[in-house]
């Protein structure tokens, strides 16, 4: 018994010493290993200031992460982050589960760019990630089959920023700052007893002449065969004029106005119900330059009538409000969510314009009378 006890003690001490040695070695060898693997995955240089590994806690951290942009683009880095941390639950592997406690990005910066040739750096970047991920799954098929359950307890982005630059048209440049994003409890394969297992949260500020606020929160089931979600979203103070370059050409370009939007999106077993509440403030249009005979109807009305209503009759001082719903079955091959939403939006604007224009005309007639 004493011999077995001594052997056990020696084994434990040796195992702990091995972990400590590996812990110390990680500070010297982990950084170049991660840079090499990152370069292999993304096909561009990857730089890391510091990296560390905690064998006892099952955690990996990196500081000063930079992913170089592809050749042909002016932005230096496509992605950078002050800190990236990954925490694993290694004991979960004993039950054929692979649990990631947390993936955290602090101060990440994503620089999306369209160069003068019309090439988009984001397309190549994300395609490389998907391609290499598929190769890894195929190469590690034994490990993938051994694990029967995957759980991501939390994915979080703190104080993130996304910058979009179009070298062909500077009016399309866009910046989104102060991004807070999180996913909680992502499970694969999905548990049939959990209708909406994953919580979603997004809060961001859109920079520009006037700052807009975006908020999204709710719950989803991303891997279920039949879509289910319960999402609430809002947009406040988004400037129309600032994003005119992103909109389709119109005979009535918007020169002023802000958008306030609330959305409640529900879906259960592919039955979708999305309710929109829209409030447009200080809306003004610029008359198109096309001859009158060539100007198409806008929202089913003559463009000059809309310009007169918003620009000349004091309508911009008041909010223009309307709401519309999108109902449908995602299993129906004839149902197109975007087409139905656009059709219902056009109808709602036309109906509200008709009501408000009629009210203005009646008020003007009473004044004259």
Each predicted region: which residue ranges?
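Extended terminal
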Residues: 1-11, 148, 221-223, 264-270, ...
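N-terminal type II signal-anchor transmembrane helix
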Residues: 1-43
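Extended lipid/amphipathic-ligand handling interfaces
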Residues: 38, 51-54, 81-98, 110-114, ...
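Secondary-structure transition motifs
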Residues: 44, 64-189, 282-308, 328-347, ...
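Short acidic/polar mixed-charge low-complexity motifs
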Residues: 44, 210-212
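Short extracytoplasmic
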Residues: 44-68
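Extracytoplasmic/periplasmic C-terminal soluble domains
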Residues: 195-199
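Low-complexity, intrinsically disordered
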Residues: 202-208
């Amino acid at each position: 018994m004493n011999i077995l006890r001594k052997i056990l003690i020696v084994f434990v001490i040796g195992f702990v010493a091995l972990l400590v040695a590996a812990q110390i070695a990680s500070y010297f060898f982990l950084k170049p290993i991660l840079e090499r693997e990152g370069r292999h995955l993304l096909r561009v240089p990857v730089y890391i200031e510091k990296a560390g590994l905690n064998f006892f806690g099952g955690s990996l951290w990196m500081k000063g992460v930079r992913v170089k942009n592809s050749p042909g683009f002016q932005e230096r880095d496509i992605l950078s982050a002050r800190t990236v941390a990954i925490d694993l639950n290694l004991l979960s592997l004993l039950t054929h589960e692979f649990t990631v406690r947390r993936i955290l990005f602090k101060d990440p910066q994503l620089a999306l760019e369209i160069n003068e040739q019309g090439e988009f750096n984001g397309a190549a970047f994300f395609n490389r990630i998907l391609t290499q991920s598929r190769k890894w799954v195929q190469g590690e098929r034994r490990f993938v089959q051994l694990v029967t359950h995957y759980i991501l307890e939390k994915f979080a982005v703190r104080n993130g920023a996304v910058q979009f630059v179009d070298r062909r048209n500077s009016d399309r440049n866009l910046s989104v700052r102060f991004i807070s994003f999180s996913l909680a409890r992502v499970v694969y394969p999905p548990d049939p007893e959990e209708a909406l297992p994953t919580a979603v949260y997004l809060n961001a500020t859109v920079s520009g002449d006037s700052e807009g606020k975006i908020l999204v929160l709710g719950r989803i089931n991303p891997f279920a065969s039949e879509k289910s979600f319960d999402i609430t979203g809002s947009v406040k103070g988004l400037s129309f004029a600032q994003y005119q370059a992103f909109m389709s050409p119109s005979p009535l370009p918007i020169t002023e106005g802000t958008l306030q939007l609330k959305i409640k999106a529900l879906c259960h077993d592919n039955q979708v119900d999305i309710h929109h509440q829209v409030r447009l403030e200080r809306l003004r249009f610029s008359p198109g330059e096309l001859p009158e005979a060539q100007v198409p109807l806008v929202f089913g009305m003559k463009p000059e009538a809309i310009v007169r209503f918003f620009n000349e009759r004091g309508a911009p001082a008041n909010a223009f409000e309307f709401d519309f719903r999108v109902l449908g079955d995602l299993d129906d091959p004839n149902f197109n969510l975007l087409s139905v939403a656009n059709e219902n939006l056009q109808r709602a604007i036309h109906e509200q314009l008709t009501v408000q224009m009629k009210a203005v005309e009646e008020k003007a007639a009473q004044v004259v009378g």
